Amino acid sequence: MKLCLVAFDGRIPMLSSIVDRFEEHVSEYLGEVKVKKKRAKLPEHAYSKVRGQYLARALLDTLRGMKGEYDRVLGLTSEDLYAPGLNFVFGQARCPGREAVVSVARLLDPDPELYLERVVKELTHELGHTFGLGHCPDRNCVMSFSSSLLEVDRKSPNFCRRCTELLQRNLKRGG
């Protein structure tokens, strides 16, 4: 499977480590995965001056045009994201779909290992949505909804048994 990771603003701490860790992690569920890095500018129209945040959905629209040869395109930004009705989001995806975006703005930590773990969890979570997985009631599952860092830190980076089965079923259908 070919994934493209688009660094939206070029200021993603530890980007190479994120790509390596994410590629290794999702290969456990998707088989051989290759992640290609690209860079892109944040779309100006996505920025809300009132909120000081970027509209996540607008970034998904930008990613849609980058699909090309890739099975999935995931954006990564250091800017804070929001969705209508929410103060912020760690990420957003088309469910099901081919595009997802994650912000590292609220995932940063002085401990580089904790930061890497958080980013991989949120990338995995949003990737799961692109394969049609919804939020999971199992609070340890990577597909559980997180509205705080505490919830991100609490959950596992892994899919629970139920979500793994759903993922495999959706992959067999052509994902």
UniProtKB/Swiss-Prot annotation:
According to its UniProt entry, the protein's GO biological process terms are: proteolysis
Cofactor(s), by name: Zn(2+)
Cofactor note text: Binds 2 Zn(2+) ions per subunit. One is catalytic, whereas the other seems to have a structural role.
Residues at which Zn(2+) 1 binds:
125, 129, 135
Named from the GO MF annotations, one term is: metallopeptidase activity
Q: Which SUPFAM superfamilies match?
A: Metalloproteases ('zincins'), catalytic domain
**Pfam families on file:** Peptidase_M54
> Which Gene3D superfamilies does the entry link to?
Collagenase (Catalytic Domain)
Under the heading InterPro entries, the entry gives:
MetalloPept_cat_dom_sf, Pept_M54_archaemetzincn, Pept_M54_archaemetzncn_arc/bac
Q: What are the protein's UniProt keywords? A: Hydrolase, Metal-binding, Metalloprotease, Protease, Zinc
Residue numbers annotated as active site? 126
What is the uppermost EC class here?
hydrolase
Q: What is its EC number?
A: 3.4.-.-
Residues that bind Zn(2+) 2 = 136, 141, 160, 163
Q: What job does the chain carry out? A: Probable zinc metalloprotease whose natural substrate is unknown. Does not show endo- or exopeptidase activity against resorufin labeled casein, p-nitroanilide (pNA), amidomethylcoumarin (AMC) (one to three amino acids in length), and hippuryl-aminoacid substrates.
Assembly description: Monomer.
Annotated family: Belongs to the peptidase M54 family.
Protein name (database record): Archaemetzincin
Please tell me the species this chain comes from.
Methanopyrus kandleri (strain AV19 / DSM 6324 / JCM 9639 / NBRC 100938)
Lineage of this protein's species? Answer: Archaea, Methanobacteriati, Methanobacteriota, Methanomada group, Methanopyri
